[in-house]
Structures are given as structure tokens and as C-alpha cells.
Amino acid sequence: MIDLMMIVYATILSAISSLVYIVIGILPGTDETATMAPIALALLLAGVDPLLVLSWFIAAIIAFKITDAIPVALAGIPGGVMAVPQVPDALTAREKGYADTLLRKGNSAALIASILTLVFTLAVAWLLLPVGDWLNTKDQVLGVSIPRWFWILFAGVIILALTSKNKLLALITIPLFALMIQGLRGVYGKNVVVSFFLGITIGPIMYEVFQSLNKDLRRSIARRGFKEVKLAKIDRIYLNPFKNINREELANILIWSPITSILATVMSPVGLTILIGDLLRESKKDKLEGAMLAYTTREGIKLGTYIGGTLIPLLVIGAPTGPMSAGPAGPFFQDIQGIGGKPFQYILSHYSYLDISLILIYSALVSLLITYPLIVKYSREITRYVFRRISAESLYGLFIAIALVLAYYDAGLPGIFGMLLVAVISGALARQGVSLGVLFMTLVGAPTIVALLKAVGGV
């Protein structure tokens, strides 16, 4: 039951989350999983109500995904990883002198998609709730008891592996990584999850850190002074989003944001963003017109995939079946001792679906009321301040420190070394073109994958 204090806490957490992720979103090259998952997990382990943490998380998605496109539009530099596909279209617009128009359209698309996809996803999840019990029913396959949702996860990890840059290595990694995880659990003597999850999360960062310890490799790292970044000038941007986009752009946002929010249940948000954007760009003969349409629609898709990829697995399936739910939203599927189970189970058992929907919509509105006006009025000033005063490396140092503390909490000193082992291997695989989503989803399905391998091998 939601009371007045719950609303107050949701307001405070959503506001803080929005302000924090406005800054993180603008920082160049920030990774969504590395910056969102550790904080959500820390809040859950600290005993914060899981529904309030989910409110924090939804507000973070909105603030992060709106702001990570700002440095793209103004400087041609991506904020988060999801903003990377936007760079070519942004550069096309900058060359033609339309950087301010691009920023205006992107902000408007993000606002519309945030509200649309959240309401749409909650409605679809409610309709699919009866399917949840069926998906959690277990069947006997080769003598192994397997929940039906596992096959959704398995299909998702195969699809993700096939869309990775290094397809063959990604496919081979699935059984190998599952065996490593189960082997480490055997050493620990318990079902450790959190430290492994954190290891994958910080993998690319830790790989870079350890690589820099090698004298020969360190010499190959380019050293430069301060980088000069020129921000495009922007004119007035209307607060009314419908004044900033045309009918065709609005139609594509209304069509593709909901569709991709469903597809993100098992598919990669980055892959969907690239695919749909490229198709729309190629549909236009005029290069600038195609870039504008692709950029605007992608801003909507970014929000759609992150919201849908989180809520449908959480509310309906009860398992992380896609890169989003297994990655940034992964903490909601981990066993948390303080609440006696998994956060998503706590949310569904302690609150009605109406209460959950209302608090999430409220948190989204709080985030939009803070983020959208700030970005519309002060995007250039905020970007300049963040670029000058805040170091991305210092934030990554903070997230690594959080990960080390949580790994110790999870499994003591062995948990830290296990996390570092998983981190180095994950980082190396990511460097070779394997999507981290493959590793996150393999982590979830590792017990079943290994059990099936043993059954097939007659062990």
C-alpha cells in the first residue's frame, strides 16, 4: 500500500537520481551497466524498499537517456554507449549547421517516448501477467528440471551472440562462461551471484586498468593534453515538444518506441537502435532529412528499449531474459538477504499492480519535470561545465570501489578475487567483440546450461 511517506521518498529519490544521471549522461563514454547497476544494487543491499529503488532506476533511465545525446548533438561526442549510433547523423547535421535543430528534436522525442512507452509497457505487462505462472512452470528435459522462461532467455542469448561483432567466439563463450561460473560457485560452496554480476559490469574498465600495468602496452597508449571540444551554438528551444518535430518524426516515434520496448525483452537495445535508425535513414534520398529522421526516432527507441527491457521481464517473466534486464536492471533479479528473496518478488508480493504503475509513472514525471526543462534551457552550459570540471575516470573509480565493497559483502575476500577474475575475462571477451549481454544472460542461465551439458554428455 502506498502512503504519503512512500510518495515523499519516491519524489526525493527520483529527483536525486535525475540530477546524478544528468551529469553522468553528459560525460563522454559512460557505460550504462557500469554506472546504473552498482548504485541500484547498493541501494537494495542498504535496505531501501525495492519499489523505491525501481523508482530511482526509472528516473535514472529517463535522465540518462535524454542527456547522453546532448554531447552528440553539440560536439559529436557520445555520452553513454547507447548514444554511439547517433554520432554519424549528428555529424551530418553539424556540417549543415543544424546542431540546434537536432538537439531540439532529440529532446522532444525522448520526452514523448518516455511517457508513451512507460504507459504502454505497463499496460502490456498487465495483460501478460497470467502468462507469468505458465512461464515459471518447470518441465523435465533430459532429466533436468527447467523453467519455461529459460527457453526465452536461451533464445535471447543466442540472438545476442549472433548479433555480436565476433559471432563464433560469442557462441563458444556461452558454455565456457557457464562452466566457469558454476566452477567458482563450487569452490565457494554457495550460490554466489552479486560478485559475478559486478565482475561483468566493471569488466571493460578493469581490463583497461590491468592492461595499463603492462610496461610495453602502457607505452602504446596515446598521451595527449587537454582535448579541445567546440560546442555548437543553439537557439531557443520550445518546451512544447510537438513544436520541435514534424508529423513524420512523431509518427515514427509513436510506432517504433512501443514496438522496440517489447522486442527489448530478449533483444539488444543497441542493436534495435542501429537497425531501425539505419532503415529510416536509407528510406530518404536527402542525406540531411534522413539523418534528422533517424536521429529523432532513435532517441525514442532508446527510451523504449530501456523501459520495456526492464519492466516486462521484471513484472511478467520473473527472470532477466534480455541484455537490459540482465545488465543494468540485473540487481532486481538477485537474491538480497535483507528482503529475504529477489527484489522483483518483493515488489509483486507487497504492492498491487496499480500501486506499482502509479509510483513508476509518478517517478517518471518527476524526472521529466527536472530533466527536460534543464536540458532545454541550459544544455550548452551544463555540457560545458561537465566537460571542464568532472572527470569520467573519477566516477569510474567510485563505481569500482562500490563493486569491491559489494563483492566483499557477497562472498568475503574470495568474492573480491572471484569478481576480479570474472572482470578480466569479461573485459577481454568484450575487447574481442563479445557483447557483455551474452555474459550477463549466461550468468543467469549457468546452472541450467551446465546441467544440460552434463545430461547430454551422460555425466
Residue spans of the language-model regions?
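Helix-loop-helix hairpins and the membrane-proximal interhelical loops
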Residues: 1-49, 130-142, 194-290, 402-404
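Alpha-helical transmembrane segments and their membrane-interface exit regions
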Residues: 42-45, 63-64, 156-160, 179-182, ...
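Loop-to-transmembrane alpha-helix initiation sites
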Residues: 146-149, 186-202, 414-417, 436-441
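Transmembrane alpha-helix interface/packing and boundary motifs in multi-pass membrane proteins
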Residues: 17-32, 63-76, 158-164, 257-268, ...
